[in-house]
Swiss-Prot record:
CDD domains reported for this sequence: STKc_PIM1
Residue ranges of domain Protein kinase in the record: 38-290
Enzyme Commission code(s) on record: 2.7.11.1
InterPro entries according to UniProt: Kinase-like_dom_sf (IPR011009), PIM1/2/3 (IPR017348), PIM_Ser/Thr_kinase (IPR051138), Prot_kinase_dom (IPR000719), Protein_kinase_ATP_BS (IPR017441), Ser/Thr_kinase_AS (IPR008271)
Subunit structure: Interacts with RP9. Interacts with HSP90AA1, this interaction stabilizes PIM1 protein levels. Interacts (ubiquitinated form) with HSP70 and promotes its proteasomal degradation.
Enzyme class: transferase
Protein name: Serine/threonine-protein kinase pim-1
Organism: Rattus norvegicus
Superkingdom of origin organism: Eukaryota
Database matches in Gene3D superfamilies: Phosphorylase Kinase, domain 1, Transferase(Phosphotransferase) domain 1
Catalytic reaction equation(s): L-seryl-[protein] + ATP = O-phospho-L-seryl-[protein] + ADP + H(+); L-threonyl-[protein] + ATP = O-phospho-L-threonyl-[protein] + ADP + H(+)
UniProt keyword Membrane, yes or no: yes
Post-translational modification Phosphoserine, affected residues: S8, S98, S261
Originating gene: Pim1
BP GO terms, sorted: apoptotic process; cellular detoxification; cellular response to type II interferon; negative regulation of apoptotic process; negative regulation of innate immune response; positive regulation of brown fat cell differentiation; positive regulation of cardiac muscle cell proliferation; positive regulation of cardioblast proliferation
Amino acid sequence: MLLSKINSLAHLRAAPCNDLHANKLAPGKEKEPLESQYQVGPLLGSGGFGSVYSGIRVADNLPVAIKHVEKDRISDWGELPNGTRVPMEVVLLKKVSSGFSGVIRLLDWFERPDSFVLILERPEPVQDLFDFITERGALQEELARSFFWQVLEAVRHCHNCGVLHRDIKDENILIDLNRGELKLIDFGSGALLKDTVYTDFDGTRVYSPPEWIRYHRYHGRSAAVWSLGILLYDMVCGDIPFEHDEEIVKGQVYFRQRVSSECQHLIRWCLSLRPSDRPSFEEIQNHPWMQDVLLPQATAEIHLHSLSPSPSK
């Protein structure tokens, strides 16, 4: 049964990465103006990354998200093959925006005198995982397993494309409530994946690994696995396990909800204090708790379609 489901999910894993040299998006200055192509709607959110608005593509009424990033807030820059200097986020999104459905797609981008504007896909209806958990509490393990599998596949896809997200958390995961599909969003803290050590980190501290807290050094893959462990705990317990630096470096995990022993084992494995003790993506996927995963559409039918939105806490 698991094999058939894995085969059904194989299209996610086998999705190719975009070749930056086959550049499909022309530099912003060569395109029609933003205002003639997109209708800007209400503000969806804002923060250190800039502001994100809902929008509509005029040509076909496609819902989009329109992200404005001020140039003076951009700390990491990249370069396209044609020499255009752009935020690293654009480079990373172009590398991962392919046929794979588990990562948000960059549809277009524009450069303005003092900012960049990114046009991203926007599923409807949609809710981020943070709000989903806040409204409904800790997830049933069957639902958490389906969600976690999809996030793991998204992170694997990014790594296969040479991209390290560096801010895996519930707020950066969108749930398509009709299809049961998850999408990893916000690559503003990301970097090109490398085998050597990283000495910078702009992600969310409570999801960061103990080696970063203690030594300001970490390796990309093992740090990603730590963040995945935090995320899985969040799913099955309804909140993150650690709030303060001293809790992160101690790494003592206490379960506030009734969680199966297999799920507890996987979480504790991902949250091993020594990076070398953490599992690989393949070991996570082969873990006993990860077997018999629901397909996204089944997840939607069983767990999402029957639920009506409840008031936020």
